[in-house]
Amino acid sequence: AEVAKRVAQADVVISTALIPGRAAPVLVTEEMVKSMKPGSVIVDLAAGKGANGVGGNCPLTETDQTVVKHGVTLVGDTNLPARVAADASALYARNVLDFLKLVVNKEGVLHIDLEDDIVAACLMTQGGEVKRK
């Protein structure tokens, strides 16, 4: 119910949910699309991975097509990252740099601050112990 409420209020919805080896889950139903404001956009990054290779996180998504249904534009591009490779690389590099600033102090020494929520959540091993699987 909360997702439906948020979708109805949104101008843009970007869905990315995929489960390896299974069809993409339906997160945005046709009824939810009908509730959206005219001119809204859904970018379905799970396009072509729905049941029987049709749809994505929204069953109205058409693989490798941009279509308008119920006044809402649905983008079903299956290779969107390749279209923005330079931007995606720059964004990734910036995120890595920002993370490194959290774990390397001004003297260039590795410093793991477990009080920092981001650092703590990213710590996989410590002192020979696996912290997360």
Can you annotate each of these PLM segments?
Residues 47, 52-133:
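Adenosine-phosphate binding glycine-rich loop
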Residues 1, 35-38, 97:
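Short, structured secondary-structure boundary patches
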Residues 12-75:
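ADP-ribose/adenylate-binding Rossmann-like module
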Residues 3, 31-32, 112:
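Short, flexible, glycine/charge-rich loop motifs used to bind or transfer phosphoryl groups or to couple energy/partner
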